[in-house]
Amino acid sequence: MKHLDYIHEVPSNCDYGTEDRSIYLTFDDGPNPHCTPEILDVLAEYGVPATFFVIGTYAKSQPELIRRIVAEGHEVANHTMTHPDLSTCGPHEVEREIVEASEAIIAACPQAAVRHIRAPYGVWSEEALTRSASAGLTAIHWSADPRDWSRPGANAIVDAVLDSVRPGAIVLLHDGCPPDESGALTGLRDQTLMALSRIVPALHERGFAIRPLPPHH
């Protein structure tokens, strides 16, 4: 039986490889009407792609943001329906969280191709990996985590990313909050936004290419 696992860096045998120093930007816990549009504006300013791991309940309540993400050339991926710790969920609940989130994304934007999933809190169980694979989703973790959700300051976020990235790195950032937190507050991700506007040009100056996550089979 094939052992299931998640991907925390993109290996050199994938579509882009690491010869061109590829980096992959990802955002969790959106879409959020106060944060996601500004994140998208910065990405558009620099012409770089990202993958948004969205929560299904937010996809249902903010379908226009799902459509905008896709229309602007980014990927929408699965971050479960309600953001539970999947390791505490039974098999049927795990399956429901995964399947309903993908359905919510497609309902919001039929053009969306849901190919990837990230477990809430980065907590993967064998059940979550198995159910994700059964749903045709590749499990994606991360290799660079500046813990921007803790609001350490824009400088700290920038430094943490630049200090930890290498070719193939998957960078974790946030454009929202889980449903059990106050995710609708204006300014919630202002530090992430400020940091992003510095991270992208700094990565380019270091010779990195920011690319969309390649498909995995």
Curated annotation (Swiss-Prot):
Function: Is involved in generating a small heat-stable compound (Nod), an acylated oligomer of N-acetylglucosamine, that stimulates mitosis in various plant protoplasts.
Gene3D superfamilies hit by this protein: Glycoside hydrolase/deacetylase
Residues given in the record as a divalent metal cation binding sites: 79, 83
Start and end residues of each NodB homology domain: 21-211
Chief subcellular location: cytoplasm
UniProt-listed GO biological process terms: carbohydrate metabolic process
CC per GO annotation: cytoplasm; membrane
Pfam family, one: Polysacc_deac_1
Keyword Metal-binding: yes
Domain of life where this protein originates: Bacteria
Protein name according to UniProt: Chitooligosaccharide deacetylase
Subcellular location: Cytoplasm
Effect of residue 116 to R: In strain: 41
Record annotation: effect of changing residue 10 to M: In strain: 41
GO molecular function (one): hydrolase activity, acting on carbon-nitrogen (but not peptide) bonds
Marked site positions, Raises pKa of active site His: 148
UniProt cross-references to SUPFAM superfamilies, sorted A to Z: Glycoside hydrolase/deacetylase
Catalytic residues, chain numbering: 28, 174
EC numbers for this chain: 3.5.1.-
Keywords (A to Z) from UniProt: Cytoplasm, Hydrolase, Metal-binding, Nodulation, Plasmid
Entry similarity comment: Belongs to the polysaccharide deacetylase family.
Stored InterPro entries: Glyco_hydro/deAcase_b/a-brl, NODB_dom, Nodulat_NodB, Polysacc_deacetylase_ArnD
